[in-house]
């Protein structure tokens, strides 16, 4: 499963055949009938954050968005954030989200592992895409 490109897991889950893997991810009890609220357990968040798929696609997605911006409206950090939100979450960032992302991109570009100039920008943008791929609105169907 580690190499899978599919981010959904389907199990048959009944009172007689409980899948123990689901206990790690806050399983729904099959003997109860109730409306489930949003929940997350630390293991679920860590599985998503450390997913090889997310790590592998963050840089190519960031590069794609950058190329789109270079051909259209100009390649600024603000434009990148807006396009990344639109592309990955199908929504625009709120003003506080936009400001937080701008500040965070700036901080990531200053990290020693970011490199210099274009490499630092690419590093920071890939990190932002990685964050958005782990955003609740990315992997939850409402």
Question: What is the predicted role of each segment?
Answer:
Residues 113-117:
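Intrinsically disordered, low-complexity Ser/Thr- and acidic-rich flexible linkers and loops
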Residues 99-110:
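Amphipathic alpha-helical segments that form the core helices of the histone-fold
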Residues 128:
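Globin-like tetrapyrrole-binding proteins
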Residues 1-88, 92, 132-142:
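An acidic, gly/pro-interrupted, aromatic-rich
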Residues 71, 110-111:
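Alpha-helix boundary/capping detector
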Residues 54, 77, 81, 97, ...:
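Hydrophobic (often cysteine-bearing) scaffold residues that line and stabilize catalytic clefts
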